[in-house]
Amino acid sequence: MRKAKPKKRYLLPDPKFSDTMVTKFVNSLMYDGKKSTAYSIFYDAVALVEKKTSESGLEVWKKALNNVSPQVEVRSRRVGGSTFQVPTEVRPDRKMALGMKWLINYARSRGEKTMTDKLAGEIISASKGEGAAVKKRDDVHRMAEANKAFSHFRF
């Protein structure tokens, strides 16, 4: 265990939308420290979403992120020699982090040609409440629902 809780690091807002959430998303999208490439992928994807849906691209992205973020998850807790999957509520910062991670990972595994297309496709489908990332969220919720009996083993 660490001695003290680490100080929270605050991110600078992104240049185009001046939103710290976008910066966080781009940071998880980035490979090998190539932030400018990650920014161009994200901005192009948002523009593509705007073109396809004729709504604000950033709003569609935020809606998609809310649809993908889990409310509850299961955590392993060892009680007397057996391990239980205990459903717990997800903290707001972790909720967003998981949503971003899932959105990016499932966008990467899509079939389109470029990452911009993949990300735009996943954002659009997630905002409609479908797609692989939303399915992952539902699986996590289903797992928590199935293990509701162990919710008295709080952390």
Swiss-Prot record:
Disulfide bonding pattern of the chain: none
SUPFAM superfamilies: Ribosomal protein S7 (SSF47973)
GO cellular component: small ribosomal subunit
Pfam families membership: Ribosomal_S7
One GO term of the biological process aspect: translation
Gene3D superfamilies named in the record: Ribosomal protein S7 domain
Alphabetic keyword roster: Ribonucleoprotein, Ribosomal protein, RNA-binding, rRNA-binding, tRNA-binding
CDD domains with a match to the protein in the record: uS7_Bacteria (cd14869)
GO MF entries: rRNA binding; structural constituent of ribosome; tRNA binding
InterPro entries registered for this protein in UniProt: Ribosomal_uS7 (IPR000235), Ribosomal_uS7_bac/org-type (IPR005717), Ribosomal_uS7_CS (IPR020606), Ribosomal_uS7_dom (IPR023798), Ribosomal_uS7_dom_sf (IPR036823)
UniProt function note: One of the primary rRNA binding proteins, it binds directly to 16S rRNA where it nucleates assembly of the head domain of the 30S subunit. Is located at the subunit interface close to the decoding center, probably blocks exit of the E-site tRNA.
Family named by the database record: Belongs to the universal ribosomal protein uS7 family.
Quaternary structure and partners: Part of the 30S ribosomal subunit. Contacts proteins S9 and S11.
Identification of the protein by name: Small ribosomal subunit protein uS7
Natural source organism: Cytophaga hutchinsonii (strain ATCC 33406 / DSM 1761 / CIP 103989 / NBRC 15051 / NCIMB 9469 / D465)
Gene expressing this chain: rpsG
